[in-house]
Amino acid sequence: MCGLARTSADPPEFIVMGGDIAHHGGEFRPTKWLPLPGNVQPSPLVAPYAKIASVCPGSLFEAIHPKKSSTEPFMLPNGPIHDDAGVAVESLEKFTEFDAQENVFAMIAHDRSLLDVVEFYPKPANGWREKGWKEQGRWRFLNDFDTSVETKEAE
């Protein structure tokens, strides 16, 4: 079950609360509507709201993507946590269309990557766009991926 909340009438802004539609941002990002940018800004490897401008090359994450893609999610729902992985994928495909809208802030339950980005109840979620929540949080999940390069010496 997902919820859609209007957070502003003029301009129209919304938060779509995906609940357990996904368990990680990599299940619904990137997409053809919201591709991995050439430069991820702010960098997911730097704390949100850092005083310095932070940029990270998108190619760093595209290189570790299972399909080397900038337009397909990093992972698909699978395993016993999903009753029906096919239905989960269909639901996520619909969710990604909300996620790509500039006036919609898409979030899922238990998203650790947003803990230092959003404010919590009883503070209001109105003004999320002005507060920069979407821009600060959109690619934060990428910090969960190991971008280190391993090298093997020839034996």
Stretches with model-predicted labels:
Residues 1-4:
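Short beta-strand scaffold segments in enzyme catalytic cores
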Residues 8-155:
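Cap/insert and terminal regions of metallo-dependent hydrolase folds
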